[in-house]
Design a protein with these regions (language model features):
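Mobile cap/lid helix-loop segments that gate and shape the active-site cleft of serine hydrolases
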Residues: 83, 89-129, 156
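Conserved alpha/beta-hydrolase "acid-adjacent" motif
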Residues: 140-149
Length: 194
């Protein structure tokens, strides 16, 4: 759909996308969605923007779940993106499904620095670029309060953004009417803000 509209679509793998060893995996889980991954994404974006066929002023980012978290992290800690779509992001590991949060980050009392460093709620006021934030209201994996708390901080900072909630949809927003609507909404957003 995006290619048909003339967009270039690129996917970057950051250093914690795949772990080479159990030791590395254990180290990486303690810094999920942290500054090192963002440095990797920014390096990739700098390369992309240096290509003659790319308009460096019209670069966007999007992701779902963990990718949605990277989108928010990138948009609140860099000025590289004109717009971003974040679907079902983890904004604070305290709000994430305990089973997965403690698997990835350990318990909050065992990794307080990790939880603090990976909370995007506190950096919402630094948002650069236009954001479309999307969440299913029945998401039992990444609870909607992740988005609500992020939105509350955007409102406090008087930052304009777009938001779409899908009632009675879970994490995957997987039924055809909702998924088709979501992709059309995202395309409409790109056309307006990129």
């Amino acid at each position: 759909m995006l290619l048909e509209k003339g967009y270039i679509v690129v996917r970057f793998d950051h250093r914690s996308a795949t772990a080479i060893s159990k030791e590395l995996e254990n180290r990486l889980t303690m810094m999920m969605s942290g500054p090192i991954e963002i440095a990797d994404i920014v390096d990739g974006i700098h390369w992309l923007k240096s290509q003659a066929y790319v308009n460096p002023d019209r670069v966007g980012i999007w992701g779902w779940s963990g990718g949605g978290s990277f989108t928010l992290n990138s948009m609140t800690n860099t000025q590289e993106f004109r717009a971003g779509n974040s679907v079902a992001p983890v904004t604070d590991w305290h709000y994430y499904d305990t089973k997965w949060a403690e698997f990835a980050m350990k318990r909050p009392e065992d990794n307080p620095d990790g939880y603090e460093k990976t909370s995007f709620v506190k950096t919402a006021k630094n948002l650069h670029g236009r954001l479309l934030l999307v969440h299913g209201t029945y998401d039992d994996n990444v609870h909607p309060q992740n988005s609500w708390h992020f939105v509350d901080e955007l409102v406090k900072a008087n930052i304009m953004f777009d938001m779409m909630f899908y009632p009675m949809r879970k994490h995957g927003i997987s039924d055809d009417p909702a998924r088709i609507h979501l992709y059309n909404k995202m395309l409409e957003f790109w056309e307006e803000f990129l």
